[in-house]
Amino acid sequence: MPEETQVHVVRHGEVHNPTGILYGRLPGFHLSATGAAQAAAVADALADRDIVAVIASPLQRAQETAAPIAARHDLAVETDPDLIESANFFEGRRVGPGDGAWRDPRVWWQLRNPFTPSWGEPYVDIAARMTTAVDKARVRGAGHEVVCVSHQLPVWTLRLYLTGKRLWHDPRRRDCALASVTSLIYDGDRLVDVVYSQPAAL
């Protein structure tokens, strides 16, 4: 008889980023004090769950978000590169509306195709590696629960893919807040529900 397995896909907490750049996969970006508090709130919310593994992206902010969750269950944080942030041409630059890289005509070619997208890792590639990460986690924690800590675009792309929606989207409409939890509920290897929560919301 199939058994229920849950994979909780957590977005990392707030990052210390005083210059406001798109940090992407750059090293050295750690959680802010608020981000650390958000990670602790997620750990509290998951404290009574049947967590048997905590797996994180190799980036510092994801590892720091995973640490208190793992500690509550007496587990070590494991690392899976499939959970890493998406690659982006604008990494290391400011990309806010009205300033930064978008004002430079030399980079406009990178914005030509929002459907792939032309400025970064293809959505289909993100979906493929995130699905691989979740499938590994599901098998690892069969009959129990596993936490995977990742990043906004990978988590949102995974959710779109698993729920049969198109992958290209308006980034402003992502339902994936800092330190949010997207819980994937499986009956055996069949996804039966997706539950979104924000345990760190103020």
UniProtKB/Swiss-Prot annotation:
Pfam families: His_Phos_1 (PF00300). One of its GO terms (molecular function) is phosphatase activity. There is a cross-link at K136 (Isoglutamyl lysine isopeptide (Lys-Gln) (interchain with Q-Cter in protein Pup)). GO terms for cellular component: cytoplasm; plasma membrane. The keyword Ubl conjugation applies. The keyword Ubl conjugation applies. It comes from the Bacteria. Keywords: Isopeptide bond, Ubl conjugation. PANTHER family: BROAD-SPECIFICITY PHOSPHATASE YOR283W-RELATED, PHOSPHOGLYCERATE MUTASE. This is Uncharacterized protein Rv0525. It comes from Mycobacterium tuberculosis (strain ATCC 25618 / H37Rv). The lineage of its organism: Bacteria, Bacillati, Actinomycetota, Actinomycetes, Mycobacteriales.
